[in-house]
From Swiss-Prot:
Localization, UniProt: Secreted, Extracellular space
Protein function: Serine protease inhibitor with activity toward thrombin, trypsin, and urokinase. Promotes neurite extension by inhibiting thrombin. Binds heparin.
Any one GO molecular function term: serine-type endopeptidase inhibitor activity
Organism the protein comes from: Homo sapiens (Human)
Keyword tags: Developmental protein, Differentiation, Glycoprotein, Heparin-binding, Neurogenesis, Protease inhibitor, Secreted, Serine protease inhibitor, Signal
High-level lineage: Eukaryota, Metazoa, Chordata, Craniata, Vertebrata
UniProt protein name: Glia-derived nexin
InterPro entries on file: Serpin_CS, Serpin_dom, Serpin_fam, Serpin_sf, Serpin_sf_1, Serpin_sf_2
Length: 398
């Protein structure tokens, strides 16, 4: 009999170092790059929607799955991710610890859990390796009562994301007879801006959405020194980007949008990768600029099944081909029935108090250049020491 293995990722972010760094396009960047490729597939079918995902969360769940896979299923996962988890477990463990380190100052929580019908039926090496590399816990639930199982999992999710994400699961996603395991990843981030946006500067301004319509939305504003730059995509279309650091300075928000308002956001998205973002970090220069940025909240739930299949991860969704022999002790044939991610982002003025130097800059007399985000844009929340992209998305209408 074939058993369902639903997977659920969720991510939550509220926005207002370790000593060892990793080489360009490091292991974590490869993981994040998989998430960016998934994002590229998602936006093709939803070009005008607000999309929020966690590339790091996607990489974590695929990594946990890889530890339970065998044969061609495992090969497909490793090929798309571009690494085998077993061979780099120690490095992944270091990266995961670095991302949640208190040295970041900003709050980052990554939680992983396997909810199972019977923990005694799960292979010990699968549990041990996931606990060691991904700090994954195992919890028993009664899938024969889908409503109760959903309540238990949703309560865990809500707690791990500080109440930002609830109702991830609905009972109809759990088969009381066939479901054997639910794998969940939660990523939570709360960052305070290094240079706070003063509430009195927030005004309603015009934002031209992806559908061409104009909307009046609250816009944050501040005059300060930020690292920014511009470059061209292979199609010779130019776009601008800026780094907005959080107060711990190990995590930043990066914003990118086309230079010309006539250029659609979709024209630059295929160009984006962790390697591209690395290049931004090397060419950006500090400038005193007037930043105008929408104040927004966006939440999106995405089924990652089809995007992953397009990338080449197909067997794990096929009940006749999936091979997760390293997960259960019995002869049950597991396959993935769902792989969902729900992510939420809130961007507001909140942050540390503005410094005296910043206050002085705010009243400088010379006219600075402007960085105005008044049309669809991309955002990235990046852990700079490792290159991990914790969150990314497109905002077409704040």
């Amino acid at each position: 009999m074939n058993w369902h293995l639903p997977l659920f990722l969720l991510a939550s972010v509220t926005l207002p170092s370790i000593c060892s760094h990793f080489n360009p396009l490091s292991l974590e960047e490869l993981g994040s790059n998989t998430g960016i490729q998934v994002f590229n597939q998602i936006v093709k079918s939803r070009p005008h929607d607000n999309i929020v995902i966690s590339p790091h969360g996607i990489a974590s769940v695929l990594g946990m799955l890889q530890l339970g896979a065998d044969g061609r299923t495992k090969k497909q996962l490793a090929m798309v991710m571009r690494y085998g988890v077993n061979g780099v477990g120690k490095i992944l463990k270091k990266i995961n610890k670095a991302i949640v380190s208190k040295k970041n100052k900003d709050i980052v929580t990554v939680a992983n859990a396997v909810f199972v019908k019977n923990a005694s039926e799960i292979e010990v090496p699968f549990v041990t390796r996931n606990k060691d590399v991904f700090q994954c816990e195992v919890r028993n639930v009664n899938f024969e009562d889908p409503a109760s199982a959903c309540d238990s999992i949703n309560a865990w999710v809500k707690n791990e994301t500080r109440d930002m994400i609830d109702n991830l699961l609905s009972p109809d996603l759990i088969d009381g007879v066939l479901t054997r395991l639910v794998l969940v990843n939660a990523v939570y981030f709360k960052g305070l801006w290094k240079s706070r946006f003063q509430p009195e500067n927030t005004k309603k301004r015009t934002f031209v959405a992806a559908d061409g319509k104009s909307y009046q939305v609250p816009m944050l504003a501040q005059l300060s020194v930020f690292r920014c730059g511009s470059t061209s995509a292979p199609n010779d279309l130019w776009y601008n980007f800026i780094e907005l650091p959080y107060h711990g300075e190990s995590i930043s928000m990066l914003i990118a949008l086309p230079t010309e308002s006539s250029t659609p956001l979709s024209a630059i998205i295929p160009h984006i990768s962790t390697k591209t973002i690395d290049s931004w970090m090397s060419i950006m220069v500090p400038k005193r600029v007037q930043v105008i940025l929408p104040k927004f909240t966006a939440v999106a739930q995405t089924d990652l099944k089809e995007p992953l299949k397009v990338l080449g991860i197909t067997d794990m969704f096929d009940s006749s081909k999936a091979n997760f022999a390293k997960i259960t002790t019995g002869s049950e044939n597991l396959h993935v029935s769902h792989i969902l991610q729900k992510a939420k982002i809130e961007v507001s003025e909140d942050g540390t108090k503005a410094s005296a130097a910043t206050t002085a800059i705010l009243i400088a007399r010379s006219s600075p250049p402007w960085f105005i985000v008044d049309r669809p844009f991309l955002f990235f929340i990046r852990h700079n020491p490792t290159g991990a992209v914790l969150f990314m998305g497109q905002i077409n209408k704040p």
